[in-house]
Amino acid sequence: MRLKGRKIFGGKVRGTALVSRRPLSFLGGVDPNTGVIIDVESDIRGENVKDKILVFPRGKGSTVGSYIVYQLKKNGVAPKAIVVEEAETIVATGAIIAGIPMVDKIDTSKIRSGQIIEVDADKGEVNVEE
């Protein structure tokens, strides 16, 4: 199934989806040293974003979240790509400075954790393998 969205930062990757149905704050929500989701309100608490394609509706929280995304990349525990319904400034800036492919305007309800997906951010597309 091919989902068409909008490129935020380019690149092409394939990997396993890690899907949250709730907005995500990187500041206080993701451990920048390990990549583990630590937000007590998250439906994916305890999961690790490392080498996953992180899928969630939108970001929330402090502007420092952009630097947490960058720190994840510097520490080698960042997601391969970020897919969201709505890109807001915090997560978009983080993806850009970290060089993480990102696409928005995607119906994330069509993606489940564990599915193999390919993100072609240059085209603004997400291909979900069935």
Curated annotation (Swiss-Prot):
GO BP annotations listed: isopentenyl diphosphate biosynthetic process, mevalonate pathway
Superkingdom of origin organism: Archaea
Keyword Oxidoreductase included in the entry's annotation: no
UniProt-annotated catalytic positions: 62 (proton acceptor)
MF terms (GO), sorted A to Z: hydro-lyase activity
Signal peptide: none
Listed transmembrane segments: none
EC code: 4.2.1.182
Reactions catalysed, as given in the entry: (R)-5-phosphomevalonate = (2E)-3-methyl-5-phosphooxypent-2-enoate + H2O
Stated family: Belongs to the AcnX type II small subunit family.
UniProt-recorded name of the protein: Phosphomevalonate dehydratase small subunit
Organism: Thermococcus sibiricus (strain DSM 12597 / MM 739)
